[in-house]
């Protein structure tokens, strides 16, 4: 089964090796056929504490790391800046 990849914005980086990522989706309302925004927060593993609030990152599904962490950060603004230097 392939691992899901989502894109979102870091809204908290207070935990050690953890960031909270807000993922927004556009879904169509089943009755009114209007697109509405739905958002959900995911706790993601950030091994190097590299990502800060406001960074746009991609997270990938992984094995459970803790009670709430089942995602890991794979790419983002900090990773691209480090690769460019």
UniProtKB/Swiss-Prot annotation:
Keywords in alphabetical order: Ribonucleoprotein, Ribosomal protein, RNA-binding, rRNA-binding
Keyword Ribonucleoprotein: yes
Gene Ontology cellular-component terms listed: cytosolic small ribosomal subunit
Superkingdom, natural source: Bacteria
Swiss-Prot/TrEMBL GO biological process terms: translation
Keyword set includes Ribonucleoprotein: yes
GO molecular function, one term: rRNA binding
Pfam families named in the record: Ribosomal_S17 (PF00366)
InterPro entries on file: NA-bd_OB-fold, Ribosomal_uS17, Ribosomal_uS17_bact/chlr, Ribosomal_uS17_CS
PANTHER family per record: 40S RIBOSOMAL PROTEIN S11 FAMILY MEMBER (PTHR10744), SMALL RIBOSOMAL SUBUNIT PROTEIN US17M (PTHR10744:SF1)
Family: Belongs to the universal ribosomal protein uS17 family.
Function text: One of the primary rRNA binding proteins, it binds specifically to the 5'-end of 16S ribosomal RNA.
Name this protein carries in UniProt: Small ribosomal subunit protein uS17
Organism: Rhodospirillum centenum (strain ATCC 51521 / SW)
